């Protein structure tokens, strides 16, 4: 799983995963 930016937790990653 790759996220644009992971800071502290997966909070910024959640909308990214939903988007695809």
UniProtKB/Swiss-Prot annotation:
Family membership noted in the UniProt record: Belongs to the plant LTP family.
GO MF annotation, one: lipid binding
Function comment: Plant non-specific lipid-transfer proteins transfer phospholipids as well as galactolipids across membranes. May play a role in wax or cutin deposition in the cell walls of expanding epidermal cells and certain secretory tissues. Binds 1-pyrenedodecanoic fatty acid. Has antifungal activity against P.digitatum (IC(50)=7.5 uM), A.alternata (IC(50)=1.5 uM), R.stolonifer (IC(50)=8.44 uM) and M.grisea (IC(50)=2.19 uM). Has no antibacterial activity.
Gene Ontology biological process terms in this record: defense response to fungus; killing of cells of another organism
Assembly with partners or alone: Homodimer.
Temperature dependency: Thermostable. Retains antifungal activity between 4 degrees Celsius and 60 degrees Celsius. Activity reduced after 30 minutes at 80 degrees Celsius.
Protein name: Non-specific lipid-transfer protein PHP
Domain of life the protein comes from: Eukaryota
